């Protein structure tokens, strides 16, 4: 049997079982291994400016593109394809190669918040973009290949399934109660108090009642807002503060750079108005359940979306509050 020469594919393919789109991006397999003594994100590499604080860098191997190729002719009566239209950007947090988010001063993180805001606005101008997703992967255990401190932004041409489910739940709650679901969640968390870790004038960091990961903290805005552009100057600075303290709390648990996935949830763009019922929040998904043990998303979590947290959130919240105190003492030196 003769096999065809390997072909580069970049398209979206429809999963009819759960009504969701899968990104096919075979060209990402060809990402080169970087030499250990060279980093494209460091000043002097020729890839980035010699002087910057934070910086937007177009992904060299994007899963989504604003000039995507036509999909392969593989559609059937069941299977659908569409172009892998979208935007993939890298957001460099600092010119320093080994610094981490909680080690940056608040004014520096505030510049990062401003850059996120600027990119949210710019990417949203494209009418084909339906969701702007800001995120960070940190640590080898979540597959990070570039240690230089950075996050990413994806502009999707569809609203991803999980976010669609969140919107539906929030809308249903609003129609039943005339309240925002996340506003009500915050009210319950504050009233209970046991899972609240950090609080400032504008944001709360807490371990949700239902958290799937032992140390999976959320940050939510106290005011009912949907995205970064609606924040006041004070709110943006307080977001920078609570991001620093939340990431620093995780690092202080076991005195090492704690791996995590950080995801920012904002309203969809160029579509239905969700301002009555959706609410800005950030979720941290740290894959560790102890200093040296990983909480794997195994068969139940992956195959059934049935998550099992092997710890009690109320007990882990006590650990996190102690780690927060430890971080503050270190920060205030």
Regions found by a protein language model. Give the residues of each.
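Active-site microenvironments that recognize anionic phosphate/pyrophosphate groups
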Residues: 2-148, 154-226, 248, 259-262, ...
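A contiguous, surface-exposed recognition patch within enzymatic or periplasmic domains that forms
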Residues: 226-235, 239-244, 273
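Extended C-terminal subregions enriched in glycine
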Residues: 238-257
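An internal, amphipathic alpha-helical element
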Residues: 268
């Amino acid at each position: 049997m003769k096999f065809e020469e390997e072909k580069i594919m970049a398209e979206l393919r429809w999963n009819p079982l759960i009504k969701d789109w899968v990104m096919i991006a075979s060209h990402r397999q060809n990402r080169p291994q970087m030499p250990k003594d060279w980093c494209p994100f460091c000043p002097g590499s020729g890839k980035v400016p010699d002087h910057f604080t934070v910086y937007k860098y177009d992904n060299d191997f994007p899963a989504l593109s604003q000039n995507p190729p036509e999909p392969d002719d593989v559609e059937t009566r069941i299977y659908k394809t569409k172009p892998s239209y979208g935007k993939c950007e890298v957001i460099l947090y600092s010119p320093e190669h080994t610094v981490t988010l909680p080690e940056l001063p608040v004014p520096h993180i505030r510049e990062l918040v401003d850059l996120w805001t600027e990119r949210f606005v710019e990417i949203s101008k494209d009418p084909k973009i339906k969701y702007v997703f800001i995120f960070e992967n940190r640590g080898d255990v979540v597959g990070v290949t570039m240690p230089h401190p950075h996050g990413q932004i994806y502009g999707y041409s569809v609203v991803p399934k999980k976010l669609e489910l969140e919107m539906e739940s929030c809308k249903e709650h609003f129609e039943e109660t005339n309240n925002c679901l996340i506003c009500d969640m915050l009210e319950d968390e504050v009233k209970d108090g046991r899972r609240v870790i950090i609080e400032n004038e504008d944001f709360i960091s807490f371990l949700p009642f239902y958290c799937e990961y032992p140390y999976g903290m959320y940050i939510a805005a106290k005011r009912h807002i949907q995205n970064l552009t609606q924040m006041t100057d004070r709110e943006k600075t307080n977001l920078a503060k609570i991001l620093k303290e939340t990431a620093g709390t995780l690092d202080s648990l076991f005195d090492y750079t704690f791996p995590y996935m950080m995801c920012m949830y904002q309203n969809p763009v160029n579509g239905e108005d969700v301002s009555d019922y959706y609410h800005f929040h950030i979720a941290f998904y740290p894959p560790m359940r102890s200093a040296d043990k990983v909480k794997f998303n195994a068969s139940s979590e992956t195959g059934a979306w049935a998550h099992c947290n092997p710890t009690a959130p109320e007990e882990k919240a006590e650990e996190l509050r102690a780690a927060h105190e430890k971080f503050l003492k270190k920060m205030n030196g």
